[in-house]
Design a protein with these regions (language model features):
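Rossmann-like S-adenosyl-L-methionine
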Residues: 2-6, 18, 22, 230-241, ...
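Short, solvent-exposed loop/turn elements at beta->coil junctions and helix N-caps
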Residues: 124-132, 196, 205, 209, ...
Length: 477
């Protein structure tokens, strides 16, 4: 029996994909196949017995749409968000939070074993949140038209169709007030939202940042024009909101999916807000990269600091340092910290943040980490000058390239702390680092081994997980 599109089947969910989709097999009785035909089905949990409709068929697998839960899994819950199945963000809301933490632990462990070749690795339970709601300090809200007029909310999963929704349960409640004020302003003054297909209209997105420790708020309206009609009237409305610190415009007239343009026009306040992670204060502008979950960021950075094992005498490199978030955490406990980041504005923020916190033992470089570090290394004459005690890397999803990893090991640090947002590329890089035999001259050969691993849940209700890994130098006999 051939599996065809639009057919319905009863399946039991036996596993989860790395994206959190349930995996169920159409039974061998129906197909006459030894192992059954696997389907990937969103919004299902291991243990669910579900009626699913086939929506896409590949050679060896397919995709199904959940039609009905026949027997729910013990780990299944009703999503709190009324639009959870439409939204592309919180894909795991049908799963208990405890089960999500287990899923993320398994995901990291499986990747480290399968891709990284770390067969005996034991990964501890994911560090989660006591209250995993209202945790995001940043929202990018798209505007558009629907049958009811101006709409604002979020994109439906894997589309650019806007679902009108003022509230998001992982964002601060104050965002609702801000969105209502912007929509009301647009309706009163006939300011049209952006039409993505035609490239017409003005208001594209509202970027909202909230300082969880300071209570400060920044609102940046992204517009498809050089100016916003009646901008003063919008500013008057927004500054009445308690905590409003900065109001600005971002100019983006390109027909692109990229949200922010390069130019920012300030309407009110300093054009940034301040917030804290631990004891470190940061200045955050509209275009700054800053972790969106400040509570778990502190957990993540404290774990990275613990793995770094600093005593105050170490020279540390922080690669992909952003606005200096990890760098400044490290600088409080290190002799010297060097940071590298490709975005010039981020390095300006990093230098400003260091000065703001009185940390004069930092130095920041603009450029690609895979270019800056090798160039710096080649210009140093002695092994002592080239040496780093600890190197911290926090790369984008693609991980590190081999040139950078080779330079890192050539600097023979005692410890490497790898912070990753993608456990698959993490595993690939760990395999490279642990299999590479390095030479330290007359002191002999050495290699790196994985000492500790810790997953951290930065994005509850999604399939994403951050991981911190400690590698230590092991002298060869």
């Amino acid at each position: 029996m051939e599996v065809k599109k639009n057919q319905d089947y009863i399946v039991t969910i036996e596993d989860l994909s790395v994206e959190g989709e349930g995996i169920g097999k159409i039974s061998e009785g129906e197909l006459g196949k030894e192992n059954g035909f696997p389907l990937f089905i969103k919004d299902t949990v291991i243990g669910d017995v579900a009626k699913v409709r086939v929506i896409k068929v590949k050679k060896n697998y397919g995709y199904g749409r959940l039609m009905e839960i026949i027997t729910p899994s013990p780990n299944r819950v009703k999503p709190l968000c009324p639009v959870a199945r439409q939204c592309g963000g919180c894909t795991l809301q049908c799963m208990t939070y405890e089960e999500q933490l287990k899923f993320k632990r398994r995901k990291v462990e499986n990747n480290l074993r399968r891709i990284g070749g770390l067969k005996d690795i034991e990964v501890p339970m994911t560090l989660g949140m006591e209250k995993p709601w209202r945790y995001r300090n940043k929202a990018q809200v798209p505007f558009g038209f629907d049958k009811g007029g101006i709409c604002a909310g979020f994109y439906a999963g894997r589309t650019h169709s806007i679902i009108d929704s003022e509230d998001c349960l992982i964002a601060p409640e104050i965002n609702q007030t801000i969105i209502r004020e912007i929509k009301s302003f647009m309706e009163e003054y006939h300011v049209a939202p952006y039409d993505e297909e035609r490239g017409t209209g003005i208001v594209r997105h509202a970027l909202i940042r909230v300082g969880f420790h300071t209570g400060q708020i920044l609102v940046c309206l992204v517009i498809n024009a050089d100016s916003l009609p009646h901008a003063d009237k919008l500013t008057e409305r927004l500054i009445k909101i308690q905590g409003m610190t900065s109001v600005c415009l971002n100019i983006n007239k390109k027909k692109t999916n990229v949200i922010l343009g390069e130019k920012v026009v300030n309407l009110f306040g300093p054009g940034y807000l301040e917030d804290k992670i631990g004891e470190v204060t940061f200045q955050i502008s509209p275009q700054s990269f800053f972790q969106v979950n400040p509570s778990q960021t502190e957990v993540l950075y404290k774990k990275a600091l613990e793995f770094a094992g600093l005593t105050g005498q170490e020279t540390v490199w922080d690669l992909y340092c952003g606005i200096g978030t990890i760098s400044l955490f490290l600088a409080r406990s290190a002799k010297k910290v060097y940071g590298v980041e490709i975005i010039p504005a981020a390095i300006e923020d990093a230098r400003g943040n260091a000065a703001r916190n009185g940390l004069d033992n930092t130095e920041f470089f603009v450029g690609k980490a895979e270019e800056v570090l090798p160039e710096w290394y080649e210009k140093r004459d002695s092994k002592e000058e080239r040496h780093a005690d600890v190197i911290v890397v926090d790369p984008p999803r693609k991980g590190c390239d081999s040139v950078l990893l080779d330079t890192i090991t050539a600097m023979h640090p005692d410890r490497i702390v790898y912070v990753s947002c993608d456990s698959a590329t993490l595993a690939r890089d760990l395999k490279y680092l642990t299999e590479k035999v390095c030479n330290e001259g007359k002191e002999g050969e050495y290699r790196y081994q994985v000492e500790k691993v810790q997953p951290v849940d930065m994005f509850p209700w999604s399939a994403h997980v951050e991981t911190v890994v400690l590698l230590s130098k092991l002298q060869q006999k």
